[in-house]
Amino acid sequence: MRIGHGYDVHRFCDGDFITLGGVRIPHKYGLLAHSDGDVLLHALSDALLGAAALGDIGKHFPDTDPQFKGADSRVLLRHVVGIVDNKGWKVGNVDATIVAQAPKMAPHIETMRQQIAADLQVELDQVNVKATTEEKLGFTGREEGIAVHAVALLLPA
């Protein structure tokens, strides 16, 4: 049994939507990133890679590589699942916390969970996503960006 932690953050930029957990959410900003900026899937990918002692997404999908420019983070997450599987591990469960003042996440969380469960090839009850604010404190409270913490439990395949 292995446990991994992932953390990622992206700052806001010009745009009119963000993508979190594979879900396109209307917003007054976009997220600045080399890929699609899905900070939730990036943190989950890091948690999975960390649990398997396989580094992080920067190692596997460097932002200096043009092939990952604008990449769909769901495709990257599925690739991470394949890497972890090849090392003899399967996902036990994942849990993530989105830290954002806005937009409101509650209307989108179930769809995020469904997308993530499909990409991880697990049941819905093995995926938890929740959201909180920092009560207008820090960079997320000032609506400068979004952060996500994620943990993953891996079991022998």
From Swiss-Prot:
Cofactor binding, note field: Binds 1 divalent metal cation per subunit.
Pathway annotation: Isoprenoid biosynthesis; isopentenyl diphosphate biosynthesis via DXP pathway; isopentenyl diphosphate from 1-deoxy-D-xylulose 5-phosphate: step 4/6
Annotated 4-CDP-2-C-methyl-D-erythritol 2-phosphate binding sites: 8-10, 34-35, 56-58, 61-65, 100-106, 132-135, 139, 142
GO molecular function: 2-C-methyl-D-erythritol 2,4-cyclodiphosphate synthase activity; metal ion binding
Residues involved in a divalent metal cation binding: 8, 10, 42
Database matches in Pfam families: YgbB
Catalytic activity: 4-CDP-2-C-methyl-D-erythritol 2-phosphate = 2-C-methyl-D-erythritol 2,4-cyclic diphosphate + CMP
InterPro entries per UniProt: MECDP_synthase, MECDP_synthase_CS, MECDP_synthase_sf
Keywords for the protein's UniProt record, in alphabetical order: Isoprene biosynthesis, Lyase, Metal-binding
Cofactor: a divalent metal cation
GO BP: isopentenyl diphosphate biosynthetic process, methylerythritol 4-phosphate pathway; terpenoid biosynthetic process
Residues annotated as site: Transition state stabilizer: 34, 133
Record EC number: 4.6.1.12
Record family assignment: Belongs to the IspF family.
Assembly behavior: Homotrimer.
Function field: Involved in the biosynthesis of isopentenyl diphosphate (IPP) and dimethylallyl diphosphate (DMAPP), two major building blocks of isoprenoid compounds. Catalyzes the conversion of 4-diphosphocytidyl-2-C-methyl-D-erythritol 2-phosphate (CDP-ME2P) to 2-C-methyl-D-erythritol 2,4-cyclodiphosphate (ME-CPP) with a corresponding release of cytidine 5-monophosphate (CMP).
Name recorded for this polypeptide: 2-C-methyl-D-erythritol 2,4-cyclodiphosphate synthase
Gene, per the UniProt record: ispF
